[in-house]
Swiss-Prot record:
The lineage of its organism: Eukaryota, Metazoa, Chordata, Craniata, Vertebrata. Pfam families: Yip1. GO terms for molecular function: small GTPase binding. Residues 30-63 are annotated as: Disordered. The chain crosses the membrane at residues 120-140, 163-183, 201-221, 228-248, 257-277. InterPro entries: Yip1_dom, Yip5/YIPF1/YIPF2. One of its GO terms (cellular component) is plasma membrane. This is Protein YIPF1. Interacts with YIPF6; this interaction may stabilize YIPF1. May also form a ternary complex with YIPF2 and YIPF6. Residues 141-162, 222-227, 278-306 are lumenal. Its main location: Golgi. It is found in: Golgi apparatus, cis-Golgi network membrane; Golgi apparatus, trans-Golgi network membrane; Late endosome membrane. Glycans are attached at residue 297.
Length: 306
């Protein structure tokens, strides 16, 4: 066992005395700014784990967390609160549009594309574009149906814009609001149900309407069969997005309640599609168009024979 004297602290002399005793010793000045000290050695495998966390987005800085906290803490009546829902880049919007056009079987649109970051930019402009696409295409369709009639005078129907806006925006906001309230009520009874926020549901409905923009443009074709084929394709694509998104939210509920919810979602979607086609494009004059053209010829033929 060591003696007590061996455990005493020993005071060293100054640097000059030590250098005089050992002139070949290497010296480093820690106050020299040109000297850099390496990092402490890390345990094996720690570098790989840090790189993995960086790729997964788990290694967030304190500044990012602070900014995120400030971003989420704005009151709902301020402009800054709603500004966060328009803070998306072009890649995110295009990726969500692609997801609504090419739904992946068995994949949830909210979990796959929205990822707890819903936006209102895409749904707002999709609905606005769809309103003008339906109104303008409906006017052009009516013009093409009566093209060539001498007694027909084209008058733009501007009221179609307001009607289309009322229908589209009411569907894109009121239906998600009712669905959100229903899911919230059922979630209080069945705790294992998947829950969505109101803005996530609005985001799903908004992006699911994108396919109707090219469909509305193609509805100008004055062929009823073509129009119904187009509406069935649009219904199949957009309806599958809604079903695959909301089925996980209700499948843990009572079987009848779950099926009734999905059927209601699909029926409202069908009602919107068929209603827009019937009101804005499928004009009653199409059925009487051949009679209106042949009637003058028959009158002229009868006059000549007499």
């Amino acid at each position: 066992m060591a003696a007590v004297d061996d455990l005493q602290f020993e005071e060293f002399g100054d640097g000059a005395t030590l250098l005089a005793a050992n002139p070949d010793a290497t010296t480093i000045n820690i106050e020299d700014p040109s000297v850099s000290f390496g990092h402490q050695p890390r345990p094996p495998g720690s570098v790989g784990r840090e790189e993995d966390e960086e790729l997964l987005g788990n290694n967030d800085s304190d500044e990012t967390e602070l900014l995120a906290g400030q971003k989420r803490s704005s009151p709902f009546w301020t402009f800054e609160y709603y500004q966060t829902f328009f803070d998306v880049d072009t890649y995110q919007v295009f990726d969500r549009i692609k997801g609504s056009l090419l739904p992946v079987p068995g994949k949830n649109f909210v979990r796959l594309y929205i990822r707890s970051n819903p936006d209102l930019y895409g749904p707002f402009w999709i609905c606005a574009t769809l309103v003008f696409a339906i109104a303008i295409s409906g006017n052009l369709s009516n013009f093409l149906i009566h093209l060539g009639e001498k007694t027909y005078h084209y008058v733009p129907e501007f009221q179609k814009v307001s009607i289309a806006a009322t229908v589209i925006y009411a569907y894109a906001w009121l239906v998600p609001l009712a669905l959100w309230g229903f899911l919230l009520w059922r979630n209080s009874k069945v705790m294992s149900m998947v829950s969505y926020s109101f803005l996530e549901i609005v985001c799903v409905y908004g992006y699911s309407l994108f396919i109707y923009i090219p469909t509305a443009v193609l509805w100008i074709i004055p062929q009823r069969v073509v129009r119904w084929v187009l509406v069935m394709i649009a219904l199949g694509v957009s309806g599958s997005v809604l079903v695959m998104t909301f089925w996980p939210a209700v499948r843990e509920d009572n079987r009848r309640v779950a099926l009734a919810t999905i059927v209601t979602i699909v029926l409202l979607h069908v009602l919107l599609s068929v209603g827009c086609l019937a009101y804005f494009f499928d004009a009653p004059e199409m059925d009487h168009l051949p009679a209106a053209i042949t009637t003058p010829n028959q009158t002229v033929t009868a006059a000549k024979s007499s």
